[in-house]
Amino acid sequence: MLSTLIKKMFGSRNERTLRRMEKSVMAINAFEPKMQALSNEELAGKTQEFKERFNNGESLDELLAEAFATVREVSLRTLGLRHFDVQLIGGMVLHEGNIAEMRTGEGKTLVATLPAYLNAISGRGVHIVTVNDYLAKRDSQWMRPIYEFLGLTVGVIYPDMSHKEKQEAYKADIVYGTNNEYGFDYLRDNMAFSLTDKVQRELNFAIVDEVDSILIDEARTPLIISGAAEDSSELYIKINSLIPQLKKQEEEGDEGDYTVDEKQKQAHLTDAGHLHIEELLTKAKLLDPGESLYHASNIMLMHHVNAALKAHAMFHRDIDYIVKDNQVVIVDEHTGRTMPGRRWSEGLHQAVEAKEGVPIQNENQTLASITFQNFFRMYNKLSGMTGTADTEAYEFQQIYNLEVVVIPTNRSMIRKDEADLVYLTQADKFQAIIEDVRECGVRRQPVLVGTVSIEASEFLSQLLKKENIKHQVLNAKFHEKEAQIIAEAGRPGAVTIATNMAGRGTDIVLGGSLAADLANLPADASEQEKEAVKKEWQKRHDEVIAAGGLRIIGSERHESRRIDNQLRGRAGRQGDPGSSRFYLSLEDNLMRIFASERVASMMRRLGMQPGEPIEHSLVTRAIENAQRKLEGHHFDVRKQLLDYDNVANDQRQVIYTQRSSIMAMTDTQEVVEMMREEVMDSLVDTYIPPQSLEDQWDPQALSDVLSDEFKIKAPVPDWIDKDHSIQPEQIKEKILALAIEHYDEKVRKVGRPVISQFEKSIILQTLDNHWREHLAAMDQLRQGIHLRGYAQKDPKQEYKKEAFSLFTMMLDNLKYEVIRILSSVEIQTEEDAQVVEEQRRADQIRKMNLMHESLSENDEASETQTFRRQEKKIGRNDPCPCGSGKKYKACHGSLV
């Protein structure tokens, strides 16, 4: 009540922001006549003038009006495009580090040039983030004339660039690239061997296009760089053959071996299922008779069973993935694109490969990872733009501290959004869609039919073929033809079926794409030929407008209202006419899981018959409530991911900062000396505990460890025999002196510069190995930490405590290992040090898998180099080589 009253008196926050910015628009417009009067040389010279004024103390905010006016005039002269007033407001929103919600067709690509130019004046760089490589290349080429006219350099990054090309690209004032590529480059930079190997500079200012897709839809899955772990293909194949023998429990209380939770996308074994799978595993000789699957020694077996169960119960061909060229290729649920190279982790991808009978690729070991949430929050300033952000404004504010400002359209939006029609069955729904498409065809109105899966798009395509309705299919299987299909989607009578339109990044122009038509002309085409093409396009354009503009048909509601709005937003661009309607059925996933009972009872009360639709605001509200519930659930998942990743992020920052400082050092002597002192102190404390009696000391064991591990001859028992009053601190001093003397001998042999090079290589190599193992330990901790809730403990607090303990242990082990190697390895020449460095590089420069929910179509993961053991592999049921008499899996094998 009070908030409504305040809004009436003062306007909403959005209205107040727009009013404030309108004053700045007036100031920019006041500069326009001055800019028009300047020659090209004078206009280009403005950049140098702005840089000097900035260096002399003027802020970017003070330069904004004149800089924006400069960009607008240059854009008009180079591209023939003049920024509208609403685009200037969008540019200001981005410059202030917020999100501009701008409808489809309002020129977001052009808007980005304003804040990009202004912030590039500081010389600290600007990153413009797109959802795929095609858009990064297209937008950088399209906007390049503006930047280059003004004396700025433009770079574009994409996966198959050479290291040198990428370094050059990042040096540019303004860089275009995908979210994945920026993130992976950051991780790769923190696995680099020297500062000169790094490609990125400071993360200064990012402008994220389709910000909702990148910062929300893709936030649940981290970016991961991984290498191949051990081959266990046979185990996947054996377990895969057992899963079809399990029976699904349809209803609670029914018999069955496993249950499926579609909301959480999980499959769980029932009590009967546990017994059944143990029986099957025993028959397959994977489990000893009478042994439990839950025994500590069978953790890996349980992991394989869970992965196989999930692969069979939850992941479906042509919905979650496709099989292409004998490989399982994931389909991104948000964009409908295939993701070559992206792989599910936790052994799930291998389980799906076993299910489909394609070659099984090795499991992956995480080498480095980060979430987009933590990556983008590292930028000094972050902003974004999209057509649909307002529904997620709370999440943007909570997680990224970004305000959403809804920018008014340049022309009034006249698209007609019709109420949803709900049918009892999918068959009725699809029949109604066919009728709607046919009616549009009669009046030559172009239609875009949106589906949520490849399966649905292909099913609909089959129905249209039966009715002899010509159409194009745009889904993950045919994205190579994407630009061509989109260019023709606005032609009179065109019918296009498209899986999720999020992130397509190309406008559907009524009448078809004039630019595409002109591009098809020969290079030496005359002006008359060009005019003829333009006239033909204008005729088609007018015909489509007369038919009602683009018709949008949604074949199913998405889990997120925002994705539905993105589909609708394809029509009605820049004041064009258009219409949209969603056709639903009670058999649709969203309705079936969340809203079917309520809507079904409503339909029964209204006496609905098969084939008849219901169109009612109550139904629409019930559907939107279901979507809100799901959006809330996904927000909680993302928030929880962030809470856990924040712990790992603090550790990541420490490691990466330390790594960079070590790479920057020319002399590592001080670091090694500090490590040596800590390691020797800790070693003495282990065998001669502080505040302990002499009877509790174990001087011989201490001497043995020093000799065996560090090649230091320290007769500790003799020291104690000669001086019974000797204190632990004195022993520490003696041991440290011997350790220094032992190491100084090595330094004298080869010289300090060679030793420093060797030290740096060993520290970085050991750090990388221990960090990799630590990431695996953190993953395992994360997997089981929720069980602490059953013991009335807060899992997040427990995770923080245990993660800190693991991190401390990792650092201690790291120091111990570095000093052990440095003390025990003999270095004869400078070549020896270089060999170690080359081995380290070879070890890490194996080709890595890059994994994320939305790798673009070009991001193909390379093959990984697999380690082959020389000796025979120890079987799980073989005697443990340690001599304990136990089976390997119950002894040292339980740690593997």
Curated annotation (Swiss-Prot):
Start-end of Basic and acidic residues biased regions: 866-876
UniProt-annotated binding residues for ATP: Q87, G105, E106, G107, K108, T109, D507
Reaction it catalyzes: ATP + H2O + cellular proteinSide 1 = ADP + phosphate + cellular proteinSide 2
Entry's Gene Ontology cellular component terms: cell envelope Sec protein transport complex; cytosol; plasma membrane
Binding-site positions, Zn(2+): C880, C882, C891, H892
Compartment(s): Cell inner membrane; Cytoplasm
EC category: translocase
Pfam families: P-loop_SecA, SEC-C, SecA_DEAD, SecA_PP_bind, SecA_SW
Chief localisation class: membrane
HAMAP family registered for this protein in UniProt: SecA
Family: Belongs to the SecA family.
Designated name of the protein: Protein translocase subunit SecA
Organism: Legionella pneumophila (strain Paris)
Lineage: Bacteria, Pseudomonadati, Pseudomonadota, Gammaproteobacteria, Legionellales
